[in-house]
Amino acid sequence: MSVSHPAHLTVLDVQDVGPHLRRLVLGDGDVARGFDALAARWSGWADSYVKLVFLADGVTYPDPLDLDEVRASLPSDVWPVLRTYTVRRLDLEARELWVDVVLHGDEGVAGPWAAQVRPGATIHVRGPGGAYAPDPAADHHLLVGDESALPAIAATLETLPAGARATVFCEVDGPDDELDVHTVADVDLRWLHRGEAAAGTTTLLDDAVRAWSWPEGRVQAFVHGESRLLKTVRPYVRERVARGDLSVSAYWRLGATEEGFRRWKAEQRAVEPG
């Protein structure tokens, strides 16, 4: 199945894994049974992502859904809205896709939907894509991010072998937002609490990384979260990590919709290639 044909999946379970984080367990149901199509594209990247596809009410779309056909035949104001989320886990044996959604009240499209969705609902899912996996040969792994990067950070820690060393800086609202992460690696996990400050407005991650005692040997770094990380943490880490050992990207931008965020990323690529 081509990428223009998203997989049609069923919400199997909904779990609140934190006060602001809801896990959607997706798979095959009675009506939507697209897991095999999704799994066929799976490459196992730790930062694998999918796009949840939200259809406009009252519009007749091609069945099966073909996004290329939609864009060619329907006006742009009824094109589906796509929202990107990192895959927390894809379990081929259990035939489940886990997607963790940060809840922001009534803001946006995906958050309000995730806040009220119940098992049995269906959703189209495009992807997965991805590009990062931890190299077991690295001497140390540095993982930096906020809630949006937490699924990828957790997936990375789960794949690290015994004896691997990692340091994690993760910014969340407070202690209740800290998650249990299972790993056999030697991990120093440091939670940074922003308190009443809004996400994307603090210097907690930048300050923590700059105060960190850089270890000897080869360091592989993963730096993802709100766009300010590109201007603060990225330059500092780039001076210390080989280009091929650095995965750095913004997952979101304060005050921007995903459409606006995509435009901003395109502008950044134009002025700073690579």
Model-inferred region functions:
Residues 1-274:
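Extended, composition-driven regions rather than compact fold-specific motifs
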